Structures are given as C-alpha cells and as structure tokens.
C-alpha cells in the first residue's frame, strides 16, 4: 500500500530540542543552548512517500498493533530493569558519598595508623580514588539514567507511530541505535508522525502481564484524573532524594516518559513484571464503560443510552412512537417498547457498552414518561409552565445549597453544627426579576429561623455566588413548608412564622428594610461586607 503525505514540520526551539547525542552535554553546555533558543523557525512543508503493509480489515490492524505493543512491553521491561539496577548503584554511591562527607569512612582496626598515612583501600564500584571522582561517577550515573529515559521515550513514540498515543509537543529523545525501531517502510521522523487512532497508553499501563495484549472496548481520550494526581504526587518526591532534574508532568503527553522513569526509580527492590503499574506510581482507573455521560451526578439514567433511545424513537423512518394519551400498559405502547428494545440491541452489537435488558427497558420507559409529560402539558399549558417554574426554582435551591455548603468549612464549629441539619428546602427561591432581565431576586422562605437566615447572609457575603451583581434580595417567598421541614429543630424552622406576620401587619420589623424595590442585602450585619446603594425615583 503506497502512500503520499505532506506534513508541516515545525522544528523545536533550542530549549525544547533534546536528543541522545546532546543529553549528556545539556548540563555542561546549558548556557550555549539557552542562548540559541530564540523564536522557532517557520513551518516547512515536507512531502513524504513510501509503502507499507496493506491492511484489509480492522482485525489485521489490531493484530499489527498488538505485535507492536508486545514489542513495546519488552522494551519497557528492559528499561525498567536497567533503571532498577541504576537505582541500586545510585543509592550505594549516595551512601558512600554521604560517608565521605561526614568523615565516617570505615577503616580496619588492625592496620590503624598505618592505613591513615597510606592510600585508602580500593573499594568496589566507582569510588576508588577520591571524593571528586565519586561525584564524577555520580554525574555519569545520572547521565545514564537520562539515556534510559530516552529509551523509554522511544517506546512511547513507537506507540504514537501506530496511532496508539495522542500527539504532543513533548521533549522526546531517540538514541541512534533505536531510530529504526518504527514501522517498516515508514520514513517519517519522530516529530513528523501524526496519530491515527485514539490513545491506548492509559489502558496499556493498566495491563498486568508482560505480554498481555491490550483488549480495550473503548479508547480513553486522556489520562484519568487519578493517574494525573499520582504523577503530580510522585514527581516532587523523587527530585530532592535522587538529586536528578525532573521535568514537570505534562498530562497532554499521555504519560511523560521521564516522570514515569523517575517514579520507577523509587522501587529499589527487584520485582516481577506484574509490578510495573505499581512501580510507575500510577493509580489507573478503568475506562468509563458508559461513554462520556454522567456529567451530572444527580442524573439517574445513563446519558449515552438516553440519547440513543431518543434518536431511535424520533428517527425519520420510525413510525412506531409512543402515544402520550395512553398508559404504558396499552397494547400500542407495549409494542413500541418491544420495537425499541430490538432496535437498541441492533445498535449496541458493535458498541463497547454492555447494557442489560433491564437498563434498556428502563430507558425506554423513562422516555415514555417524557412524552407523557409533554402530552399533559399540551393539554394545560399554564400548568406545564407552573411545573417548569417550580422545577427551575428547586434546581436553583439545590445549587445554592451546594454553594453554601462548600464554604461552610471556613466557619466556626458552632455554625457547622447548625448547618448539619439544613436541607435545600430552607434555601431562598432565586426567581427571575420581572423588571430587570438577567437579575435574580433571592426570596428567603418565611418559615426559616432568624438565626439561620443571618448565617445564610454571611455565607452569601463570603461566596462568589452570593456577591454577584445580578443577584439581589427580595421579599420573603410565598412557599409553604413541607411536612419534613416542620419536623426540623427550632434553630432552623420557625413554627410561628404565620403569627409573626399577622402581628407585624403592614409595618416592617425593626432592622429589616422595605421591599418596595429589590436591593442587595436585608441584613444590617452585612454593612462590613457589602456596599449598599439604593436609588429611588421621585
């Protein structure tokens, strides 16, 4: 299979370029390389032609990928073994250098003073002459570790050549002896290759065995949050102890080779190949078997499955659709459910998602309830609008409760104990202003206790949501308490709120302002937090 491609190649700058031939000179010639790192040269179009293996099906392509993965596993094991050996040597050198610094070089007692004036005894390893040569040997070991890091980077780059890793402008080095370990017939340079498939690095690290092939139903698009957190935690611990210069972890490079190597150096003892994932310091989470859904934790149904049911039901060629005027147990709606189940199973044959029949049927019934609600709202538009408004206010109360709870940890223990029994029903109703579009009018519930009301005002004064310019306070809401709210303690629920309103009449209570116009605050204790500006038209 012949191919021809034109690639826009942007050579890296002097600060980013780093290959095996200059890895050892990067520390000594740091000043020279730094002076050359100016503006990067413009992109140069490169035309590449060649021939390669003709793949007839996806199975053959996966077979080629699996062969390359097996080869990459072997290279990774070799690099890991060399890294462990260098780690043991590095630790022994550090111990000996520490003894030399402290003047605690072990001298046999029988020779005593005769050995004090003679040359020091020969020791195994690089420390034979003086501490100066020991430091030179230590730097040589560090350079050798850098070369091992380049070897590991070759493994990652080989996966990128296959399209198994995402492209990223990371500093990758390639030894001269390993430059020809790419795909046969491929003449692209390392920085010129473009990915073909989705990344497999996260799942590749998660494999247990040495030659266990990667059978992934769904390709991960990026490193899992647990993996990124583990890399961030592991990298600062390795730098001060080993004395090596560690590059910062870059999640967009899909497993930085240098960070992985330095994390592997933490494991000094020999281990089997099954310990690769543990020695790399990665906490790999499995692929999300439900796709990119579950954005909202409160969502009961899977988002991917719900969208699939919606698309199948509303397809232009589909005549079997739910009848909202009938029950779910009607013969027509039952036939629609059976039809949707058959279509969903056909759609999910090649899908990596493994849904049970119960989940499929539940998604169909949930969509029927949606169509049923739409039908009822069409019969009574005012009732539908009212339910929609109530749902919007309830959603805003949940969000307000979450915002206030997130900053409650900054308050005292007494306020935290009071907040433990608070529910979303005690939050204010953030209604849309009828006079000013885009303005929310926060109307506190009438049955909320005064102490909790003051605490809510202080929470709003210290939160980003509460101090928004488009959020103002209004009169108490007309919402009545539920049966659950009436069981709350008196510190949260005021059982005499109706009597107090009747006694107050038209006069405002002391300390509470009038609600003729929406205003920013109605608590006098907030004068130190919020600037009050009231404008009245005569």
From Swiss-Prot:
Keywords: Isopeptide bond, Phosphoprotein, Secreted, Signal, Ubl conjugation. One of its GO terms (biological process) is cell differentiation. Disulfide bonds: none annotated. GO terms for cellular component: extracellular region. The modification Phosphoserine is found at residues 224, 285, 428. Residues 101-131, 233-253, 488-523 are annotated as: Disordered. The keyword Membrane does not apply. One of its GO terms (molecular function) is RNA binding. Residues 1-17 form the signal peptide. Its main location: secreted. It is found in: Secreted. There is a cross-link at residues 128, 221 (Glycyl lysine isopeptide (Lys-Gly) (interchain with G-Cter in SUMO2)). It comes from the Eukaryota. This is Uncharacterized protein C14orf93.
């Amino acid at each position: 299979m012949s191919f021809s491609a034109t690639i826009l190649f942007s050579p890296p700058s002097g600060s980013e370029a780093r290959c095996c031939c200059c890895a050892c000179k990067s520390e000594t010639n740091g000043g020279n390389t730094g002076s050359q790192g100016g503006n990067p040269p413009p992109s140069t179009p490169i035309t590449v032609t060649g021939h390669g293996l003709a793949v007839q099906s996806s199975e053959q392509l996966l077979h080629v990928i699996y062969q390359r993965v097996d080869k990459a596993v072997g290279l990774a094991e070799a690099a890991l073994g060399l890294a462990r050996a260098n780690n043991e040597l590095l630790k022994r050198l550090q111990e000996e250098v520490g003894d030399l610094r402290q003047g605690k070089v072990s001298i046999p007692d029988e020779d005593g003073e005769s050995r004090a004036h003679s040359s020091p005894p020969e020791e195994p390893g690089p420390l034979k002459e003086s501490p100066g040569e020991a430091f030179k040997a230590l730097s040589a070991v560090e350079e050798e570790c850098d070369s091992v890091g380049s070897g590991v980077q070759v493994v990652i780059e080989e996966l990128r050549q296959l399209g198994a890793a995402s492209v990223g402008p990371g500093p990758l080095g390639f030894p001269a002896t390993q430059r020809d370990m790419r795909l046969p017939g491929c003449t692209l340079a390392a920085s010129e290759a473009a990915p073909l498939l989705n990344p497999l690095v996260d799942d590749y690290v998660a494999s247990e065995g040495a030659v266990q092939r990667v059978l992934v139903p769904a390709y991960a698009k990026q490193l899992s949050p647990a993996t990124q957190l583990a890399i961030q935690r592991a990298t600062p611990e390795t730098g001060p102890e080993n004395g090596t210069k560690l590059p910062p972890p870059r999640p967009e490079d899909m497993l930085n080779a240098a960070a992985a190597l330095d994390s592997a150096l933490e494991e000094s003892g020999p281990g089997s190949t099954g310990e690769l994932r543990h020695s790399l310091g990665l906490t790999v989470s499995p692929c999300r078997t439900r796709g990119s859904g579950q954005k909202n934790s409160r969502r009961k149904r899977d988002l991917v499955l719900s969208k699939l049911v919606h698309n199948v039901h509303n397809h232009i060629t589909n005549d079997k659709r739910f009848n909202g005027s009938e029950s779910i147990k009607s013969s027509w709606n039952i036939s629609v459910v059976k039809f949707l189940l058959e279509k969903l199973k056909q759609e999910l044959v090649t899908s990596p998602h493994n849904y049970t029949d119960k989940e499929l049927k539940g998604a169909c019934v949930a969509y029927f309830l949606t169509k049923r609600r739409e039908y009822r709202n069409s019969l009574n538009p005012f009732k539908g609008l009212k339910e929609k408004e109530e749902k919007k206010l309830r959603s805003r109360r949940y969000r307000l409760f979450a915002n206030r709870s997130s900053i409650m940890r900054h308050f005292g223990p007494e306020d935290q104990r009071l907040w433990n029994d608070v529910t979303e029903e005690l939050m204010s109703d953030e209604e849309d202003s009828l006079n000013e579009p885009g303005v929310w009018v926060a109307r506190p519930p009438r049955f909320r206790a005064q102490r909790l009301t003051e605490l809510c005002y202080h929470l709003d004064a210290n939160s980003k949501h509460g101090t928004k310019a488009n959020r103002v306070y209004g009169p108490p809401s007309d919402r009545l308490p539920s049966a659950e709210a009436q069981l709350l303690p008196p510190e949260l629920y005021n059982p005499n709120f109706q009597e107090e309103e009747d006694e107050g009449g038209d006069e405002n209570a002391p300390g509470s302002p009038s609600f003729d116009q929406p205003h920013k605050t109605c608590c006098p204790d907030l004068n130190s937090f919020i600037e009050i500006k009231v404008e009245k038209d005569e």
